[in-house]
Structure formats: structure tokens, C-alpha cells
Amino acid sequence: MEAETKTLPLENASILSEGSLQEGHRLWIGNLDPKITEYHLLRLLQKFGTVKQFDFLFHKSGALEGQPRGYCFVNFETKQEAEQAIQCLNGKLALSKKLVVRWAHAQVKRYDHNKNDKILPISLEPSSSTEPAQSNLSVTAKIKAIEAKLKMMAENPDAEYPAAPVYSYFKPPDKKRTTPYSRTAWKSRR
């Protein structure tokens, strides 16, 4: 009860108020030091309650392949445990960096018409809430509209704008060589 009467820093209070809109108990933890291990972070999170799921992300390819991405996701058993983790961990120093702890937001991926236009979450990242809403047209409908326009343009060419002449990049030489290239010809010109 004493923890409930405690005043929260303004930033943590606004983060916790966002939690009322969340359905799950999933948190995004960012600004992780590259030296922090999955094991140590999991041990730190278990102090706040039962961890149902923990996703520590690594680079899959490129120059940083196998190295941590600098953020992770954690699901707690209850909302109270998640809120306590936000209160205690947000802004705390972990190795050389201050942790950023937020409620995770579902990122939505739209599939094409052949897959029944299902809208499914592909991951939970904080950036997804800032993306503008996409139009309701499916990708296949847009492709079909563009193909129809191209077909119409091919059938009814515009006389006002003639087609550009085709340039041949591999133009055959005017003269065919009878002998192979020789450097001695360059030396004799000097």
C-alpha cells in the first residue's frame, strides 16, 4: 500500500496511463547496452514478477549479424507486474546506458487479396503507433488498377507524345577488326 501512495515521476506516470489502453502485459525495453546479456536482463526482469515470454532480438544478417539489436520485449503474468517494471526500470542505468521501458504496441501487416486480406500483427514495436493509417485498398487492387491503366495506354497511344527512340547500348562497331587489339599501336604514336 505504501507503494501506491508514492508519487511517480511525470514521465513514468504518462507511460503507465498509456497502459490502460493496452490489452496485454507486454513491454518494450530499449536503449540496451550491447554488452548486456539475455541472461542478465531476464534475471533483472524476474525481480518484478513472472515472465511469461521474453524476446531478445539479434541482427539476422549484415555486418552486425549475431549482435543484439538494442531492444527486447517481455510479457508479464499480470498488469501490476508490468507497471512495477516500468516504474522501476525506466530511466535506470544498465551498464553504460539508461533503459527505456514502454508499453509495446502491435505493428500491423496487411496481406494481399489472395490471402483474404487478413490484418495480422507481425511484431510489437513502439514505432507502429506513429505510423499513419493506410488506405483500405488492398495491394492487389492497386496492382490491377495500374495494369489496366498500362493496358489502356498501350492500346491508345498518345499522338501528342511520341515514344522515345530506343537506344542500343551494344551497338555493333562500324568496322570489324581483322586483328586482335595490340598495345604496340599506342607506343608507335608517341
Curated annotation (Swiss-Prot):
Q: Which residues form the RRM domain?
A: 25-106
Keyword RNA-binding listed? The answer is: yes
Alphabetical list of SUPFAM superfamilies matching this protein:
RNA-binding domain, RBD
Q: GO CC terms for this protein? A: cytosol; intercellular bridge; nucleoplasm
Q: What keywords would UniProt list here?
A: RNA-binding
Mind telling me which Pfam families this protein's record contains?
Answer: RRM_1
Domain of life assignment = Eukaryota
Task: State one molecular function term (GO).
Answer: RNA binding
Q: Show the segment(s) annotated as Disordered.
A: 166-190
Tell me the protein's name: Probable RNA-binding protein 18
Organism listed in the record: Bos taurus (Bovine)
The top of its lineage is: Eukaryota, Metazoa, Chordata, Craniata, Vertebrata
